[in-house]
Each structure stands twice: as C-alpha cells, then as structure tokens.
Amino acid sequence: MEVAEANSPTEEEEEEEEEGEETISEPRPHTRSNPEGAEDRALGAQASVGSRSEGEGEAATADGGAASVPGAGPKPWQVPASASEVQIRTPRVNCPEKVIICLDLSEEMSVPKLESFNGSRTNALNVSQKMVEMFVRTKHKIDKSHEFALVVVNDDSAWLSGLTSDPRELCSCLYDLETASCSTFNLEGLFSLIQQKTELPVTENVQTIPPPYVVRTILVYSRPPCQPQFSLTEPMKKMFQCPYFFFDIVYIHNGTEEKEEDMSWKDMFAFMGSLDTKGASYKYEVALAGPALELHNCMAKLLAHPLQRPCQTHASYSLLEEDEEAGEEEATV
C-alpha cells in the first residue's frame, strides 16, 4: 500500500499551478482599447518615466560640475567646480509666478543690427520691449495671479517697477528707457537686489506640497564679453539651490569672436548657464545680426511654467511628424 507524502503536491495541484503560470504570462489581447498590446508595454515603461531628477536634461548628468568651455583654463569669475547640481523633484503644478524681468540697457542694445519683419534694421532694445510686453500680457491671460516686476541693468541695477499683477503698470515703465555706455556688469548687485525685494517660499515637503508661488528671473542681456562683478556668497548659493527659484537667460551677442579678447561670448554664456545648479532654468543665445524673430521665439518658449516644463535639453517644439521622426532617428544614433 502506497502512502503519499504529506508535503508533496498532488497531480491536480500541479496542473492548477501550470495553468496559473500560463495565465500570468499570457499578454492581453490586442483589442481596440489595447492596440498592439500598448498597455502591456506601458507597464514596463512606467519604471523609466521619471521627473526632472530622474534623468531629464542637465539635472541628472554625471558631469555634476559647473559648465565650462573645453580647453579653457580656470577663470576667477567662473563658478567653483565644487558647486554640485541639486536634484529635487517638485509637484508639477501651475502655481502663481513672481516674474522679475531684468532688461539690459547697455549701448549695444541700441545698435540697429537685428533684421525686422519688413526687412529693415532695428535694435535689440525695441525688439526686447515688444517681446517683454507680449510675454507679460500673455502670461496674464493664462493666470491673472501672476505678478511681474521690471529691473533695468546698467553698471548697476535699478528696481523700476514693483511686483504687480497688472500688465499695464509694468508696460507703462517699459518704453521710456535710454541706453548708456556700461564699463562693468555688476551681477552680484543684481542678485542682491532680487534677494532684497523678494522672499522665496518654504514648504514642509518639497516633493509633495505645492508652493504658494515661485520666483523666476528673466535676464535679457546684450553687451560684449566682460568679467562680471560676482562672487558666489552663501545666500546666493541657497537662492540658486532653492527649488522655487529659476534664472532664465536670453543672451544677445555679436556672434563674432575676437582672438585678442580674454573671453568670448561663448565663455560668458557658459558662465551664466553654470549658475543654475538644478538644471531647471532655460538659456538662449541669439546673434545680434540675425532676424528679430529669433528673439520673439525665445521669449515665447519662456511662457511655459517653470514647474511644468521639462529640462531644456528635453524640450521639443516641433509640430510636424517629419520633425518628430527626424528627432527620433537622431536620438537612436
């Protein structure tokens, strides 16, 4: 008489386990609600879909140092290499913005080199004034709780229009401006002024609690490459590391490089970009001899909310399928 072991499974139990394994491994049918097994593929892809801190753009690069130009030696105005990038995940919400627009008034802004829409030549100041007004009025239509301030930059910075949610108040100060010859660029004074006039919000949990507002500085800058007056103090370092502070740049340059100069416009652009320790700000450069349309395009790209936009290296503005396919081909090479 054969006695079955108490711990050994019976044939019926083995068959049930085999059927269960087949059921788990069997993919869902390709129905209209699940074309080509898209939902099954999405399950595996969800693990790779992350936020800004999980591999988007500059914030998750392995080269966590400050941006520098290849082959260039260390310069005293460069951010120290020890300033590592801060990877922070924040809720992607459309909270109110406090936008501080800093407009350069150096004499280079009055040189008529930009090509306007009708083919004539215009200067960068006129184009910047128009694009700033369009930006402010458009942001106001998106969310009437956004606030705007205007700062003009000469040798020093002046707070021209306080934070206001009325676009007309800022625009009334925008056009009565004159350029001047500037010998230096006091970048440290600009950030000190911003710190005095604004207060960065604080939340109990950065990753889950939306902030009451964010502070964004947009610098429209155009002058020959020069060594800025700047030293990264501890308060400034905290400001740049704050997840609710953003420093966007529109740099208008002459497009040429003089061999006799100590630094080129590329050095200056790289230095300004290196101030962003989170990889969350947007930086654009436009040649002074190019079309004015490029400036308008850059300002239009800055309309996106800084908490909701991707890192700049992941941003795509193409609408045609051809451009999208071309972009995919480039990414797979």
From Swiss-Prot:
- Any idea what this protein is called? BRISC and BRCA1-A complex member 1
Extract the ranges annotated as region (Disordered). Answer: 1-85
Q: Which residues carry this modification: Phosphoserine?
A: S8, S33, S53
Its localization reads: Cytoplasm; Nucleus
Q: Which domain of life does the protein's organism represent?
A: Eukaryota
* Major subcellular site: cytoplasm
**GO terms for cellular component:** BRCA1-A complex; BRISC complex; cytoplasm; cytosol; nuclear body; nucleus
VWFA-like: region residues = 99-302
| UniProt record similarity statement | Belongs to the BABAM1 family.
Q: Which keywords belong to this entry?
A: Acetylation, Cell cycle, Cell division, Chromatin regulator, Cytoplasm, DNA damage, DNA repair, Mitosis, Nucleus, Phosphoprotein, Ubl conjugation pathway
Enumerate the InterPro entries for this protein.
BABAM1, vWFA_dom_sf
Name any Gene Ontology BP term.
mitotic G2/M transition checkpoint
Q: Where is the composition biased (Low complexity)?
A: 58-67
Q: How does it assemble?
A: Component of the ARISC complex, at least composed of UIMC1/RAP80, ABRAXAS1, BRCC3/BRCC36, BABAM2 and BABAM1/NBA1. Component of the BRCA1-A complex, at least composed of BRCA1, BARD1, UIMC1/RAP80, ABRAXAS1, BRCC3/BRCC36, BABAM2 and BABAM1/NBA1. In the BRCA1-A complex, interacts directly with ABRAXAS1 and BABAM2. Component of the BRISC complex, at least composed of ABRAXAS2, BRCC3/BRCC36, BABAM2 and BABAM1/NBA1. Identified in a complex with SHMT2 and the other subunits of the BRISC complex.
Source organism (scientific name): Mus musculus
